Amino acid sequence: MSTESMIRDVELAEGPLPKKAGGPQGSKRCLCLSLFSFLLVAGATTLFCLLHFRVIGPQEEEQSPNNLHLVNPVAQMVTLRSASRALSDKPLAHVVANPQVEGQLQWLSQRANALLANGMKLTDNQLVVPADGLYLIYSQVLFSGQGCRSYVLLTHTVSRFAVSYPNKVNLLSAIKSPCHRETPEEAEPMAWYEPIYLGGVFQLEKGDRLSTEVNQPEYLDLAESGQVYFGIIAL
């Protein structure tokens, strides 16, 4: 074989190779699809994390450290004013004990922090109901003494004289004793105080009369105002 033939064969062998199907355009398309898939997965993962940790989405109502709902002071004030207006036209009474009379419960309505409103009356030391309905009845007395030379039993009772039947009925009653044991004669007597509070809701009729009683009025402590009182509020 001649030298020229050999050179020509080498040149033919070094010619351009045939391109594979797809070429650079196919590679770019695959790269774009890969990037799109990665971004889609990353976005979905981020959204899931935000929802899981409640960074986005509906927020819960704000609560106080004690897990109590915070109260809007404006709404609370409106509620209190509405309740006050609702009670302003209903019968009510709050009477206090006369500190000038010892040894008995004498109720007074013409004193500071005492009142009779919307038909309520104080007659013969009794509160007179002006209309049928549900009423909150309450009363408190305070007993005091020095030592316990003997066993002391104290009672406080609220009674009703109804127009529908003549007999007196006890609505509220309580018994207490300040002395769990007698004070020795050689020991110095210690002062004791025993309050009794009564309260309840009852259906009353127009003309019913309410009174209070204590079994040992000599132990009543009337030294300070606001300690002994009697009241009724229509509901």
UniProtKB/Swiss-Prot annotation:
Keyword presence, Disulfide bond: yes
InterPro entries: TNF, TNF_alpha, TNF_CS, TNF_dom, Tumour_necrosis_fac-like_dom
Extracellular compartment residues: 57-235
UniProt entry keywords in alphabetical sequence: Cell membrane, Cytokine, Disulfide bond, Lipoprotein, Membrane, Myristate, Phosphoprotein, Secreted, Signal-anchor, Transmembrane, Transmembrane helix
Entry GO terms, CC: cell surface; extracellular space; plasma membrane
Record's subunit section: Homotrimer. Interacts with SPPL2B.
PANTHER family attached to this UniProt entry: TUMOR NECROSIS FACTOR, TUMOR NECROSIS FACTOR FAMILY MEMBER
Family membership noted in the UniProt record: Belongs to the tumor necrosis factor family.
Job description of the protein: Cytokine that binds to TNFRSF1A/TNFR1 and TNFRSF1B/TNFBR. It is mainly secreted by macrophages and can induce cell death of certain tumor cell lines. It is potent pyrogen causing fever by direct action or by stimulation of interleukin-1 secretion and is implicated in the induction of cachexia, Under certain conditions it can stimulate cell proliferation and induce cell differentiation. Induces insulin resistance in adipocytes via inhibition of insulin-induced IRS1 tyrosine phosphorylation and insulin-induced glucose uptake. The TNF intracellular domain (ICD) form induces IL12 production in dendritic cells.
Protein name: Tumor necrosis factor
Species per Swiss-Prot/TrEMBL record: Oryctolagus cuniculus (Rabbit)
